[in-house]
Amino acid sequence: RNIYCENDANCFALSEAKDGSASHYKIVFGVILGSGCGGGLVVDKKIISGKNNLSGEWGHNPLPFYGINEDISVLQSTLDTNLDIEKFISGKGLEALYFENFKKKISAKEIFSKKNENLKFIENFLNRLARSLSLLINIVDPDAIVFGGGVSNEIENLDLLRDMTGNFAGKKSIKTSFIKPKFGDASGVRGAAILGRDTIY
């Protein structure tokens, strides 16, 4: 019996590109913002893994830096040289940053549930996310970006996020569609099933 393995973010992207919310797009990038920060690239409904199987690992790039005061304070308050995007916009990253700022240990879900209390913190998160997504636009320029994962579920306005991303990508407006997944949290498992079926048959 053969066993096939694939990255969860790739499976998520495949599911949504095959017959999910991004089924009518050619180039689809799936973003998973959960405890970590992952991604998957699908072109013509096929996963693009790359020579090193790293094509979707955008979260391990350094956070684009624009001299934002809040970023400077983070750099000054830690000796950690890890400036990966994942450190700033993933669930675990947000929890660590929140503790550094307020000396309180709360979950990422709690941060967003107390929106009024944490408005500036959430604004900083969206700003960093938009900067990070601008890298995807400038390098891959996908037709659509599908957002999955617990942190993504907390983003209320994807159109606003798209406009912010466009500004950092050097255009006032971008045509890339920012969309929610049709199959929600089940899309990764579903994509794995699709991949297994297509590989065998």
Where are these regions (language model features)?
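Phosphate-binding/catalytic loop of phosphoryl-transfer enzymes
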Residues: 1-80, 191-201
